[in-house]
């Protein structure tokens, strides 16, 4: 399999049902080696569900998904995942290094001891995430930003071709946010494909190569510079043309009938406003 295949993502006509309700429909999305793609949308829009579907944790009702050249869950050696921070048990008495090593479990195998390559991968991941000096510290002693970097290091320990990040900027201070932004851009420049969900619209517009507006389906998918039509943002977030959000993302101005970027051809999605 080529490097370009390992860094690729292809989602075609995806639909997902959860609890008997359709939460995603007609999702079409692609990413290539070295892309940095941001998924933006309101709470409940399906952003995390898209990531979980790519991981094989959610089964599609319809459509196809290929990540790192394989079906979801099949290419796990090449996929790293950073969940939302609250999903980790931070009160568990374990060191930073041990958490990062846990990211190598599938590579090591169950009930087997880590080898030299595993220790090298963990050391490199800790250094990349700026956590090498805290390797022996218990995770319960860490700040919010440090905890986020531990989860990123754990994902990097797999040496992924594709890195999926769920709300990586939530609850971190400005220096950590700047450090993470620099890290993500560097990883992308080195050929890692990154897909992140975030509510930090300013950060996403300043950092991502492409922005995908999501509300149960793909509303628009383009570069930040091209997503200046307020109509796309109004439809995604259910806001009026006078909303301050439009100024925040640089989309304030007359509402035009044409849509910037690549608009979804599916029927207009209902606006999700809660998780």
Where are these regions (language model features)?
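Helix-to-loop junction immediately C-terminal to a conserved catalytic motif
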Residues: 55
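Conserved ABC transporter NBD signature motif
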Residues: 63-75
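Conserved ABC ATPase "signature" region
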Residues: 116-134
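Conserved ABC ATPase signature
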Residues: 138-142, 146
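Catalytic Walker B motif of ABC-type/P-loop ATPase nucleotide-binding domains
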Residues: 163-167
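Conserved switch/coupling elements of ABC/ABC-like ATPase nucleotide-binding domains
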Residues: 216-221, 225-226
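ABC ATPase nucleotide-binding domains
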Residues: 225, 229-275
């Amino acid at each position: 399999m080529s490097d370009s295949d390992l860094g690729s993502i292809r989602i075609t006509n995806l639909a997902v049902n959860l609890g008997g309700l359709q939460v995603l429909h007609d999702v079409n999305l692609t990413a290539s080696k070295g892309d940095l793609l941001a998924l933006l949308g309101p709470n409940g829009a399906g952003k995390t569900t898209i990531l979980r579907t790519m991981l094989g944790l959610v089964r599609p009702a319809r459509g196809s998904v290929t990540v790192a050249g394989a079906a979801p869950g099949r290419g796990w050696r090449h996929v790293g995942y950073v969940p939302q921070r609250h999903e980790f048990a931070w009160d568990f008495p374990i060191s930073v290094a041990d958490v990062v090593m846990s990211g190598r479990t599938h590579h090591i195998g169950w009930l087997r001891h880590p080898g030299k390559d595993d220790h090298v991968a963990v050391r490199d991941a800790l250094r990349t995430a700026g956590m090498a000096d805290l390797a022996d510290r218990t995770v319960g002693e860490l700040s919010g930003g440090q905890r986020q970097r531990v989860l990123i290091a754990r994902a990097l320990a797999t040496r992924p071709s594709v890195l999926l990040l769920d709300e990586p900027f939530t609850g971190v201070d400005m220096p950590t946010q700047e450090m993470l932004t620099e890290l993500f851009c560097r990883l992308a420049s080195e050929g890692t494909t990154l897909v992140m969900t975030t509510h930090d619209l300013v950060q996403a517009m300043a950092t991502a190569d492409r922005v995908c507006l999501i509300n149960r389906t793909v509303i628009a998918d383009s570069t930040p510079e091209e997503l200046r039509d307020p109509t796309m943002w109004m439809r995604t977030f259910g806001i009026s043309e006078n909303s301050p959000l439009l100024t925040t993302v640089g989309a304030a101005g007359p509402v035009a009938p044409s849509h910037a970027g690549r608009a979804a051809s599916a029927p207009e999605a209902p606006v999700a406003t809660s998780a």
